[in-house]
From Swiss-Prot:
Swiss-Prot/TrEMBL GO biological process terms: nitrogen fixation
Protein name (record): Ferredoxin-like protein in nif region
Keyword Protein transport found: no
Gene3D superfamilies on file: 3.30.70.20
Residue positions binding [4Fe-4S] cluster 2: 20, 39, 42, 51
Amino acid sequence: MAFKIIASQCTQCGACEFECPSGAISFKTDRFVVDPKICTECRIEFDAPKCRAICPMPNTCVPA
């Protein structure tokens, strides 16, 4: 499984893109998106998903 970003809640601060260790988050057209083929949910590198931890808005970066 991968994560997704709820666009209607996203402030577009870009913190998640910068923090993502796998480079799965990018800005496309008018929103940040997570590429499910690249997203590792930070399982190997960290105890929790970095996008979820860094996001200033609760429940914006969620399991897909």
